[in-house]
Amino acid sequence: MTGLTYDSGALIAAERKDPRLWAVHKRALARGVLPIVPAGVVTEVYRSGRQARLAQLLAGCQIEPLAETSAKAAGVLLGRCSIDPGAVDASVAESALRRGDCVVTGNPEHIQALATGVNRKLDVIRI
């Protein structure tokens, strides 16, 4: 299994006990793959310490800070994209493209449009 990058849709699915998301997550951990969650994704989803399922998911993930070079690369993705998916989706796409990860997402159209804008392709798992 390649690496995984989670977007906001994946974290929301975890909160909602989506069995598809939890199956992907457990399979990744069993294979020694630690999913990546860009920090902006946490900002979009986290609201309080009472989100037990979100906390459980994040305990088995690596939160990736947004470095200046990554922020600029995500901005380039936005500038070349045919739609306006937003800065957080751009940071998810940049993060996954940099490592060759598969993106676990509720909105594959946004992620794929960002990659297409720079003539790249990202594999996605729709949740």
Annotated model-derived regions:
Residues G9-A10, G40, T69, E109:
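Alpha-helix/helix-capping structural signal
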Residues V37, P65, A87, T105-G106:
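Short beta-strand scaffold positions
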